[in-house]
């Protein structure tokens, strides 16, 4: 099954020239005012949790501004609160509003790196989790990497987390009594309140350069300039990989969306790994680490690895795929398949992308068929076999299809972060995942039997 064309068709409904044309009037209006003041105010709106999912609109507007050349913004006039509100309401009422979903992610999460830091999740699902585990792989597991790579990575991660902590601390120390209403447009606070938040996204130039020890290669890695090519793609705005805009006149760095930082830090680490020729090694170590963490999560839920050789099973692994068999209770077993992004054809120019792992289509089905036959031959009933498919990547969505198989229960497809949460919240619940899969299967069967319409899995 080929998923990517359908995904692209859906994205094109909102992306590209339509979104660019809709915000073009608001971009022209911006040319009347001090562009750095205006753009920092737009960025500050992302710091209100009520606007967590509205970044799709705010980022598209910032992208529209950045695709202009710097000399198109000569004005020094500060925009009034009324004019600013008018612009935001204007872009909030475009077709982009139909792409907004209710927030599903925590607004703030913790990251440990020789101290405690807090980051904004933005609209990504697992940025803090990915960053925390990448930090562990590089600095806490005793794996040797080139000293120059580790030095550059340490400076980069430490500097960005310092900026993030300053921003989050400022947010949490400021009272926010605004209502959350997803049906309304972008929430715009009072001018005084917005000014306080605007200060949080601006860093003095000398302080910014000091954080990164004046290393030009790191400053260039994170800083963008005007005159970029417009990107209508929601997932890959031009500034997503370089989210800081430098105001040379005031010697200030403006963070264009604070929610980008945890994801961008991981991206920059991969860029540095490529520079030092260890990209594949870092990615493989990261995926191995996550695989072992997932085994711990499942163990906490009562699913311990079994000695599969006693059942005549030979485990298989390849680039992007691992597996093992775990216990449930009594005579029940769970087949665990781990699919991960091995970094092949990785594009170091984009923060997010979608890859089609066609090789998974065959290997997943073939291995499931193999395991089922061996386990049933060993004496386990088919209704006592469960399947968990863990899918892990760093910003790249993996599209694959599994051929229809005669399961008793459809496989549970899950991300390591979700599995970790379940292992914490449901630790006291006996065999939670198998019970969930049974209940889900019963619900689907009930709907198919009782509904006059064909069941649609969404």
Show which residues each predicted segment covers.
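A short acidic/basic microdomain associated with nuclease active sites
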Residues: 296-328
């Amino acid at each position: 099954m080929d998923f990517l064309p359908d995904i692209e068709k859906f994205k094109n409904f909102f992306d590209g020239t339509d979104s660019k044309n809709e915000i073009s009037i608001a971009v022209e209006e911006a040319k009347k005012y001090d562009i750095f003041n205006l753009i920092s105010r737009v960025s500050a709106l992302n710091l209100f949790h009520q606007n967590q999912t509205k970044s799709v609109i705010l980022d598209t507007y910032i992208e529209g501004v950045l695709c202009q050349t710097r000399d198109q913004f000569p004005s020094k006039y500060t925009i009034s609160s009324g004019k600013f509100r008018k612009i935001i309401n204007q872009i909030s009422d475009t077709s982009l509003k139909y792409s907004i979903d209710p927030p599903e992610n925590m607004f703030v999460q913790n990251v440990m790196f020789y101290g405690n830091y807090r980051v904004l999740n933005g609209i990504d699902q697992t940025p803090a989790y990915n960053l925390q585990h990448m930090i562990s792989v590089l600095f806490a597991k005793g794996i040797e990497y080139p000293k120059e790579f580790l030095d550059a990575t340490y400076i980069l991660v430490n500097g960005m987390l310092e900026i993030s902590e300053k921003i989050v601390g400022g947010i949490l120390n400021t009272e926010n009594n605004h209502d959350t209403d997803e049906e309304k447009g972008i929430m715009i606070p009072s001018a005084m309140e917005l000014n306080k938040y605007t200060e949080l996204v601006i860093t003095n130039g000398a302080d910014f350069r000091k954080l990164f020890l004046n290393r030009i290669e790191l400053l260039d890695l994170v800083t963008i300039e005007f005159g970029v090519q417009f990107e209508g793609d929601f997932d890959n705005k031009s500034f997503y990989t370089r989210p800081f805009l430098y105001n040379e006149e005031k010697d200030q760095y403006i963070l264009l969306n604070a929610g980008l930082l945890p994801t961008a830090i991981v991206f920059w680490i991969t860029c540095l790994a490529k520079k030092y020729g260890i990209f594949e090694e870092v990615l493989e170590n990261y995926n191995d680490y996550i695989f072992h963490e997932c085994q711990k999560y499942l163990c906490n839920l009562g699913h311990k690895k079994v000695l599969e050789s006693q059942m005549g099973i030979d485990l298989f692994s390849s680039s992007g795929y691992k597996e093992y068999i775990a216990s449930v209770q009594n005579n029940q077993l769970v087949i665990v398949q781990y699919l991960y992004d091995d970094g092949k054809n990785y594009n170091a120019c984009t923060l997010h992308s979608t890859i089609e792992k066609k090789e998974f289509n065959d290997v997943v089905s073939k291995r499931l068929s193999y395991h089922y036959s061996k386990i049933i031959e060993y004496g386990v009933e088919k209704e006592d076999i469960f399947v968990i498919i863990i899918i892990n990547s760093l910003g790249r969505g993996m599209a694959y299809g599994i051929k229809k198989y005669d399961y008793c229960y459809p496989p549970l497809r899950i991300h390591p972060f979700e599995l970790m949460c379940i292992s914490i919240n449901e630790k006291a619940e006996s065999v939670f995942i198998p019970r969930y899969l049974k209940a889900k299967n019963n619900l689907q069967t009930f709907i198919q039997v009782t509904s006059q319409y064909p069941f649609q899995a969404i």
